[in-house]
Amino acid sequence: MDTELLKTFLEVSRTRHFGRAAESLYLTQSAVSFRIRQLENQLGVNLFTRHRNNIRLTAAGEKLLPYAETLMSTWQAARKEVAHTSRHNEFSIGASASLWECMLNQWLGRLYKNQDAHTGLQFEARIAQRQSLVKQLHERQLDLLITTEAPKMDEFSSQLLGYFTLALYTSAPSKLKGDLNYLRLEWGPDFQQHEAGLIGADEVPILTTSSAELAQQQIATLNGCTWLPVSWARKKGGLHTVVDSTTLSRPLYAIWLQNSDKNALIRDLLKINVLDEVY
């Protein structure tokens, strides 16, 4: 039997209205009616009496109701258990593009290197904006978030992983801020509070991106400057700090749900340094 038919039956019996059941199930009213007819044909009985807007369960419908509830409950439990089994070795890590490019890519390599060959995890490296990742974490669609700003929510656990240094870089030596176009690389909401004082309140970015690789590649073309992690920029080469600029220290946090069933695993993974240089 198609569980969607039982699901539709339960929703109509709950709302006693085909239109409201359709809205709740994100279906058309005709689709709901069709499903109920299918179920009635399979069982060989009428499940509802229909008189204008007055929809009631028949005696057969009343008898089916507890069985339908039990079947759907069992089906949901089975789906959850199977999904949990299939996800047992999966672990999702979310961060912005710039964090993956500048530091987390190397950490991911270290995680794989330190895995037991027989119990190795299947990692998912997820790239998205911080706000989206916080939502995914809250909804249990993400296991671990790496970010520069810890969300102030009681249900989250956090661990400070260390700090990294940002400097303002351009593609040629001996350049001043006034000679360059500004490329905004997103380093978290609180970074924008410092940005105006470090760049200039009237400075309008010629480009905004969440990718350090993209920003770095566009610096020369756009005669620009952007904030990049010092350790990453040194490895890249061909980059020079802007003469009349300063540096800025940024924290890096690991965030996860307090009641996550992967708490012990998360703490083990975080024993492997996320940053190449921790201070």
UniProtKB/Swiss-Prot annotation:
PANTHER family reported for this sequence: HTH-TYPE TRANSCRIPTIONAL REGULATOR HDFR, TRANSCRIPTIONAL REGULATOR
DNA-binding region (UniProt annotation): 18-37
Keyword Transcription regulation set for record: yes
Domain HTH lysR-type intervals: 1-58
Cross-referenced HAMAP family: HTH_type_HdfR
Organism: Escherichia coli O17:K52:H18 (strain UMN026 / ExPEC)
Similarity section: Belongs to the LysR transcriptional regulatory family.
Lineage per the UniProt record: Bacteria, Pseudomonadati, Pseudomonadota, Gammaproteobacteria, Enterobacterales
GO molecular function: DNA binding; DNA-binding transcription factor activity
GO biological process, one term: negative regulation of DNA-templated transcription
Record Gene3D superfamilies: Periplasmic binding protein-like II, Winged helix-like DNA-binding domain superfamily/Winged helix DNA-binding domain
One Pfam family, short name: LysR_substrate
Keyword Isomerase in record: no
UniProt KW keywords: DNA-binding, Repressor, Transcription, Transcription regulation
Protein function: Negatively regulates the transcription of the flagellar master operon flhDC by binding to the upstream region of the operon.
InterPro entries (alphabetical): LTTR, LysR_subst-bd, Tscrpt_reg_HTH_HdfR, Tscrpt_reg_HTH_LysR, WH-like_DNA-bd_sf, WH_DNA-bd_sf
Protein name: HTH-type transcriptional regulator HdfR
